[in-house]
């Protein structure tokens, strides 16, 4: 089952050299402090991002708070799933339904963990096919789409 999470992208903290982990931990501590009023399950580092999971459905409200933490570039509301294609395809449909009005979309898959058997192009096709079935009146548009569905395969 897909869990709603916040995927935190950060600024120049990621450019630091040997002390990068130290700065990432400081940023994680600052995020935890900012989210003291929320029921946070975990704040963890994954492949150049910080993942914040919750015990309750609080990701939408928490994203607004996380955006105010110094060092945070942006916060994406996301769904965390297993590597099961049915799970991540269902999460993609759910995410696109939540997007709001749109006429065109694009799928952009990225794998930082290359031990997964599907390539990024395979994932694009697989998720795109499911989205085309779920939204038959919407167009796939590679350049300047109204909505973009990102699929990240990490750790």
Where are these regions (language model features)?
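RNA-binding accessory domains that recognize and position tRNA/RNA substrates
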Residues: 1-155
């Amino acid at each position: 089952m897909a869990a709603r999470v916040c995927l935190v992208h950060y600024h120049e903290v990621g450019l630091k050299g040997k002390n990068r982990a130290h700065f990432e931990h400081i940023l994680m501590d600052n995020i935890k402090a900012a989210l003291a009023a929320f029921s946070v399950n975990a704040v963890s580092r994954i492949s150049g991002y910080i993942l914040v999971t919750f015990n309750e459905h609080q990701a939408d409200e928490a994203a607004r708070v996380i955006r105010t933490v110094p060092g945070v570039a942006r916060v994406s509301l996301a769904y965390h799933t297993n590597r099961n294609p049915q799970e991540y395809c269902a999460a993609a449909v759910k995410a696109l339904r939540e997007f709001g009005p749109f006429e065109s979309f694009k799928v952009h898959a990225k794998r930082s963990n290359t031990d997964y058997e599907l390539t990024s192009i395979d994932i694009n096709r697989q998720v795109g096919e499911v989205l085309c079935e779920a939204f038959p009146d919407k167009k796939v548009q590679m350049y300047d789409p109204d909505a973009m569905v990102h699929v990240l395969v990490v750790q």
